[in-house]
Amino acid sequence: MIDTLTIVRPDDWHLHLRDGDALADVVGDTARQFGRAIIMPNLKPPVTTTAQARAYRERILAALPAGTRFEPLMTLYLTDNTTPEEVRAARASGFVHGVKLYPAGATTNSDAGVTDLRRCAKTLEAMQDVGMPLLVHGEVTDPTVDIFDREAVFIDTVMQPLRRDFPALKVVFEHITTKHAAEYVRDAQGPVGATITAHHLLYNRNALFVGGIRPHYYCLPVLKRETHRLALVAAATSGHPRFFLGTDSAPHAKGLKEHACGCAGCYTALHAMELYAEAFEDANALDKLEGFASLHGPDFYGLPRNAGTLTLTRSQWQLPAEVPFGEQMLVPLRGGEMLRWKTV
């Protein structure tokens, strides 16, 4: 039995940090474990320009705890009006590392998202030309499509035409949740990668309904059936370089989760690597954690691997039931429960 595991310092390739006082309360949780993180742009208003990304980056750096070494990797929010010129400016900035596709209405703060990807053809061509990755929330928003099928339908109706029209465009299929997506990414031609969250590795959709509605397990894309969870575990632990860590840690105030119409998102930044270690240990694949968490992501993005290390030890500890979040409180996934790994 392994009791201590030291890996190259990991990165988080999909993270929500919010802004203002809330940002200040959560950014330290990520910086404590990760060297870098891809920062999602779905603020209100969204981060749609390089200038806005620069300003947000400066706010993140200012909010870091003293002595912290952490690099926020910024992204732009793709809209119907994003121009090729903005893409080229973003690429030249050195701090914008992706452009995020949110189908309009697909998730939190996505109302400004793309209504028809065909309107973005010139922008996507510019991204392909300059090597700017497209980060995709892979769900359709057609109300006639069952919520559990939205990812599979997205592959057929959006992803496949996108890859056909822009075969050299680097695409990250974010927070995949289905066997279909895992197989698509594994077998795709050209530069395609995928992030996988800890909660989608650990839980299936039953977790939403144990003893009643469990709002802190509600996220988008929603948890799927066990067949899909097992396929995600197989992908994450396979050692395949197209799969890498992205927490999709998404903090919402307790009152907005425990609500008649609660927000989607699980807060896992506080204990992300502990959760991933648990998932990989359950699959007898702790030896594959370093590749997934620390190596595959920077290799895909064309960035250097981190120089430092992170150590996890087998240690029972109780996760706080809730933590400060601006003027309110935030409930982490599994808040108040015991964990069996701890970062040191």
Swiss-Prot record:
Its Enzyme Commission number(s) read 3.5.2.3
- Top EC class, one word: hydrolase
Catalysis performed (reactions): (S)-dihydroorotate + H2O = N-carbamoyl-L-aspartate + H(+)
Q: Tell me the active site.
A: 248
Residues engaged in binding Zn(2+) 2: 100, 137, 175
Presence of keyword Metal-binding: yes
> Which InterPro entries does the annotation name?
Amidohydro-rel, DHOdimr, Dihydroorotase_CS, Metal_Hydrolase
Q: State any GO CC term.
A: cytosol
Cofactor(s) demanded:
Zn(2+)
In terms of Pfam families, this protein maps to: Amidohydro_1
Q: Where is the PTM N6-carboxylysine found along the chain?
A: 100
Q: Which domain of life is it from?
A: Bacteria
Q: Where does this protein hold Zn(2+) 1?
A: 14, 16, 100, 248
Q: Which GO terms describe its molecular function?
A: dihydroorotase activity; zinc ion binding
Biological process annotations from GO: 'de novo' pyrimidine nucleobase biosynthetic process; 'de novo' UMP biosynthetic process
Q: Copy out the cofactor comment.
A: Binds 2 Zn(2+) ions per subunit.
- Pathway, per UniProt? Pyrimidine metabolism; UMP biosynthesis via de novo pathway; (S)-dihydroorotate from bicarbonate: step 3/3
Entry binding sites for substrate: 16-18, 42, 137, 220, 252, 264
Q: Does the keyword Chloroplast apply?
A: no
UniProtKB keywords? Hydrolase, Metal-binding, Pyrimidine biosynthesis, Zinc
Q: What does this protein do?
A: Catalyzes the reversible cyclization of carbamoyl aspartate to dihydroorotate.
Q: How does it assemble?
A: Homodimer.
The record's PANTHER family line, in alphabetical order, gives:
DIHYDROOROTASE (PTHR43137:SF1)
Q: Which NCBIfam families match?
A: pyrC_dimer
Family to which the UniProt record says this protein belongs? Belongs to the metallo-dependent hydrolases superfamily. DHOase family. Class II DHOase subfamily.
Q: What is this protein called?
A: Dihydroorotase
Its lineage reads: Bacteria, Pseudomonadati, Pseudomonadota, Betaproteobacteria, Burkholderiales
Gene assigned in the entry: pyrC
